[in-house]
């Protein structure tokens, strides 16, 4: 059959396309001078999928006995989820409801975010007043109406976004607790109400002299707090409060903790049988998480010395390993056949091996999410400069590094820390999609708390994710050298220990002199007083503690503590502040306990 001009052109076009495709495949081949190839290693094969998470609802938290702290939500579009996250971190049992009658069955009631005739009926507002006169406690954040000013002893002032500092009238002896930060510029502008004190007991003021917190005793207590605590908690825990913080790292920044502890103390004072779930394992004052960022050529080999320090003291630590199999602007290849046995030794020694990405790029926070099908060795991120990278995605950084560490070293990778603490908004859902459960991606000073907390979808205000953040407290890159600021670090940890907090220590094992001595001294100094170990081990403890359900109920004519634990639980204590009683819980997964309180 004769070829027509059209068929000849088509044949030529097909040949050109085939040549282009062949050239593309050739260009995509691994370059052995830049990329280390592990023979026979390909993966991960399964795709990672971002599953949509429905928004958290008030109904999910509308449960529990009347002995809990009640949060009466008068606007469901407010920051109420921030209150839930904060109180759970602090171990305060809460019931969240939109039903005033149900809330008023509790002795201590938070009305959030507003008290006003626009959101509560006259009868409901009178119910709040009667609750106080009957011996209960009511805390209002925005007392905007309803004729309760005389009861609370204050007169509402202007709502502003320019107040940045709150100072307590009674000193704690700790400067960072006596004056806290509550707002700043840009996205972190948190509205506040400056009250005029008429007959209340003033407890705190803003920098403009207006009253920030006050209580008036009328049989019970009527209190106000002029800070939108829910909104502040959401901004801070979502990593959107950087300009509020007084330090980036290596400091004590308890601003959020101080406010939650103040409300906790109102609950303890006003509830006849209050209880608190401990924030630290039984018998310890503080938790110190020992972590190491392995992101430099010599760091892999040096990690053995750090692991030996831990092992000889019966401890475990976390080693966040960069799976650097591409030579680029940052460094030479150091995740290869020579170093994999060193990482396997860490695993054999019981260390927690976590991911520190593939590229370790400052651009991580600006990367696209990716397809969830990124696979080694085709996934080849290339860092051009300090701030730019080619061929990298968030999912690729997470899934490929996790796959390589697990496949080549036998590690079970559940912990993640990004290079340079670069923190994309899509990270929480990407972590879930790729199988992580513990994140250490931001500094404690930025989030204004020294406790772990649960992450939310897109670092937003709606949906909770099953991943907890363990923010960095002490890091080794600021001046002076880490080994020269041992005393300064201990001052910070001592302040955290006063309240049973968590201190996460970040060390780069690029050297083994002053940094290694720092870790040895730290462990020896806190031996006996602190729980010390890996992020994975503490993360599992914290997640089980967070899932624990506790209640005080009437049982056979007397009060009893009921506990139910979906996960295996050890060394969690329940504190009863008024009696001084402490109950330790050790439960199997699905275990329950009923303890008479007398």
Task: Give residue ranges: language-model regions.
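N-terminal Sec-pathway targeting helices
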Residues: 1-17
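A glycine-centered loop/beta-turn motif at secondary-structure junctions
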Residues: 66-69, 84-90, 137, 191-274, ...
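Helical hinge/lid and interdomain linker segments adjacent to catalytic or ligand-binding clefts
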Residues: 70-150, 319
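A glycine-rich, often tryptophan-bearing local segment used as a flexible ligand/cofactor-contacting loop or short
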Residues: 118-185, 192, 197, 205-207
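Metal-dependent polysaccharide deacetylase catalytic core of the NodB/CE4 family, i.e.
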Residues: 147, 287, 300, 311-426, ...
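Catalytic grooves of carbohydrate-active enzymes
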Residues: 292-294, 412, 467-540
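His/Asp/Glu-enriched short active-site or ligand-binding loop at hydrolase and phosphoryl-transfer sites
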Residues: 432-461, 469-479, 532-542
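Surface beta-strand/loop "capping" patches
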Residues: 538-576
């Amino acid at each position: 059959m004769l070829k027509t001009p059209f068929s000849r052109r088509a044949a030529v076009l097909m040949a050109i396309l085939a040549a282009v495709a062949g050239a593309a495949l050739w260009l995509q081949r691994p370059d052995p001078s830049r990329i280390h190839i592990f023979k026979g290693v390909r993966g991960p094969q399964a795709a990672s999928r971002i599953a949509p998470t429905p928004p958290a609802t008030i109904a999910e938290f509308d449960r529990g006995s009347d002995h809990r702290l009640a949060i009466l939500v008068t606007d469901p579009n407010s920051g109420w989820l921030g209150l839930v996250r904060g109180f759970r971190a602090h171990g305060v049992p809460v019931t969240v409801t939109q039903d005033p009658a149900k809330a008023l069955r509790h002795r201590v009631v938070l009305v959030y975010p507003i008290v006003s005739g626009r959101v509560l009926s006259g009868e409901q507002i009178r119910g709040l007043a009667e609750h106080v006169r009957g011996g209960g406690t009511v805390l209002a954040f925005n007392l905007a109406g309803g004729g309760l000013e005389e009861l609370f002893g204050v007169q509402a002032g202007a709502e502003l976004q320019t107040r940045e500092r709150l100072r307590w009238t009674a000193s704690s002896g700790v400067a960072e607790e006596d004056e806290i930060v509550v707002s700043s510029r840009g996205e972190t502008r948190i509205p506040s109400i400056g009250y005029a004190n008429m007959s209340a007991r003033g407890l705190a003021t803003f920098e403009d002299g207006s009253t920030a917190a006050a209580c008036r005793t009328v049989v019970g207590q009527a209190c106000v707090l002029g800070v939108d605590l829910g909104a502040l908690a959401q901004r801070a825990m979502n990593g959107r409060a950087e300009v509020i913080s007084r330090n980036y790292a290596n400091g004590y920044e308890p601003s959020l903790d101080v406010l939650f502890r103040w409300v906790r103390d109102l609950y303890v004072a006003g509830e006849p049988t209050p209880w608190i779930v401990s924030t630290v394992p039984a018998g310890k004052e503080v938790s110190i998480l020992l972590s190491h960022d392995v992101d430099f050529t010599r760091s892999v080999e040096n990690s053995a010395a750090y692991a030996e320090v831990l092992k000889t003291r019966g401890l475990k630590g976390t080693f966040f390993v960069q799976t650097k199999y591409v030579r680029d602007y940052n460094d030479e290849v150091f995740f290869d056949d020579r170093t994999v046995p060193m990482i396997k030794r860490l695993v054999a020694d019981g260390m927690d091996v976590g991911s520190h990405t593939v590229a370790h790029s400052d651009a991580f926070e600006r990367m696209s999410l990716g397809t969830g099908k990124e696979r080694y060795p085709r996934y080849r991120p290339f860092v051009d400069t300090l701030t730019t990278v080619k061929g990298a995605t968030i999912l690729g950084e997470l899934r490929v590094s996790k796959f390589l560490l697990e496949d080549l070293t036998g590690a079970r990778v559940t912990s993640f820390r990004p290079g340079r603490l670069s923190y994309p908004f899509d990270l929480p859902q990407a972590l879930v999609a790729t199988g992580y459960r513990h994140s250490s991606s931001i500094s404690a000073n930025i989030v204004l708390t020294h406790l772990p907390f649960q992450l939310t979808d897109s670092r937003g205000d709606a949906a909770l994710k099953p991943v907890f953040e363990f923010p960095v407290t002490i890091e080794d890159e600021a001046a002076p050298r880490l080994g020269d600021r041992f005393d300064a670090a201990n001052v910070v940890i001592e302040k955290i220990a006063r309240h049973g907090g968590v201190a996460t220590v970040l060390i780069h094992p690029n050297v083994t002199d002053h940094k290694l001595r720092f870790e040895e001294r730290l462990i020896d100094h806190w031996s006996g007083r602190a729980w010390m170990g890996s992020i994975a081990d503490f993360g599992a403890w914290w997640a089980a503690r967070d899932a624990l359900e506790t209640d005080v109920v009437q049982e056979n004519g007397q009060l009893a503590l009921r506990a139910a634990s979906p996960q295996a639980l050890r060394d969690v204590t329940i504190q009863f502040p008024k009696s001084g009683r402490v109950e330790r819980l050790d439960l199997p997964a699905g275990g329950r306990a009923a303890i008479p309180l007398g």
